[in-house]
């Protein structure tokens, strides 16, 4: 257990930097849609597959990553995986075809797969219990700084240096993150083989848990849906349906992600207070998700009149779902 506040802040900052990069890479395709579509003549299906490549690599690695984290710890697992992300990011910057872009995105997804769960694993061991929930909430806030950075800042740089140079800059940030992790993150006590067998048994128990099973469709369709909107489809919608130009679209994405940033702040502040009054997060989910459904329905009905102002409350109400999983 790490008791020194300065050391804890340093560890958090190093992990947060890596997670910031992870989410910058996750959502940057929404801002780059016009540039990539023009250069590679991409269809809507191509764009969807390109954005999904990140999540494909990311999701396939989650269970193996969890086992690796338990055995080898965040320092080694995040560090080595980020090398894969570094390769994927450089490869994306030099890609000459859609296939090259897609393969690179899959590599990026694989490489950043431990950027959240790795820190949470470390916090559980290194931080006092009273600080763990706060650190977890702040990590989710950091994610939205990455989302925000992928909007207007990227759009401003785009005509100046081009999207390929932007990815090379991100690659340099990944390299810095790898170095910081290797130097500043504590080592991990390697677990024995019997502990790995217990991990497999625990995984089996999770998949048999009725409450977990009941939340799987909710996470798949609802949280997955808002991620699809946030990281890709909100941008093309504003460009092709509402008639926004590239700057207006990036501005819309900026405010969507700023809303999400403050939403984590608000939910992080009020959830413990509501919980102390007997109002658990599941009750809040049951209230807020229907609100988001109504807003999504209005977006469909309004068509070209539904701009960023309609997508921002969807971002806010959907953020109750990940808070449920963190309990």
Predicted regions and their residues:
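Juxtamembrane intracellular "pre-TM" segments in multi-pass secondary transporters
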Residues: 2-4, 188-215
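Extracytoplasmic
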Residues: 11, 17-34, 42, 230-235
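Extracytoplasmic gate region of multi-pass secondary transporters
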Residues: 29-30, 211-254
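Helix-breaking motifs and short loop linkers at transmembrane-helix boundaries and internal kinks
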Residues: 41, 73, 94-99, 302-303
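Conserved MFS/SLC helix-loop-helix module at the cytosolic interface between two early adjacent transmembrane helices
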Residues: 61-94
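Cytoplasmic helix-loop-helix junction between adjacent transmembrane helices
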Residues: 104-142
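Helix-loop-helix hairpin linking two adjacent transmembrane segments in secondary transporters
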Residues: 139-183
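Conserved small/polar residues in nucleotide/adenosyl-binding loops
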Residues: 317-323
């Amino acid at each position: 257990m790490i008791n020194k506040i300065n050391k804890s802040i340093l560890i958090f900052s190093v992990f947060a930097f890596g997670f910031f990069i992870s989410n910058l890479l996750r959502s940057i395709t929404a801002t780059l849609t016009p540039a990539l579509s023009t250069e590679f003549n991409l269809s809507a299906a191509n764009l969807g597959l390109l954005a999904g490549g990140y999540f494909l690599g990311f999701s396939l690695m989650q269970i193996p990553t969890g086992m690796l984290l338990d055995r080898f710890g965040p320092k080694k697992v995040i560090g080595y995986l980020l090398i894969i992300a570094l390769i994927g990011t450089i490869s994306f910057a030099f890609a000459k075809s859609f296939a090259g872009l897609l393969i690179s995105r899959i590599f990026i997804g694989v490489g950043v797969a431990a950027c959240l769960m790795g820190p949470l694993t470390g916090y559980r061991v290194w931080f006092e219990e009273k600080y763990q929930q706060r650190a977890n909430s702040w990590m989710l806030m950091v994610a939205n700084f990455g989302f925000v950075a992928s909007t207007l800042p990227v759009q401003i740089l785009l005509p100046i240096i081009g999207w390929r140079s932007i990815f090379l800059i991100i690659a340099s940030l990944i390299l810095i993150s790898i170095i910081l992790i290797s130097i500043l993150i504590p080592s991990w006590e390697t677990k024995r083989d019997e502990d790995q067998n217990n991990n497999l048994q625990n995984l089996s128990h999770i998949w048999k848990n009725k409450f977990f099973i009941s939340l799987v469709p909710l996470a798949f369709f609802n949280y997955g849906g808002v991620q699809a909107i946030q990281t890709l489809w909100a941008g093309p919608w504003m460009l092709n349906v509402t008639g926004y130009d590239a700057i207006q679209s990036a501005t819309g994405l900026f405010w969507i992600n700023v809303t999400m940033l403050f939403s984590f702040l608000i939910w992080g502040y009020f959830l413990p207070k509501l919980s102390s009054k007997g109002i658990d997060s599941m009750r809040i989910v049951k209230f807020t998700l229907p609100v988001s459904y109504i807003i999504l329905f209005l977006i469909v009905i309004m068509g070209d009149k539904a701009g960023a102002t309609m997508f921002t409350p969807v971002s806010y109400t959907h953020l109750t779902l990940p808070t449920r999983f963190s309990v």
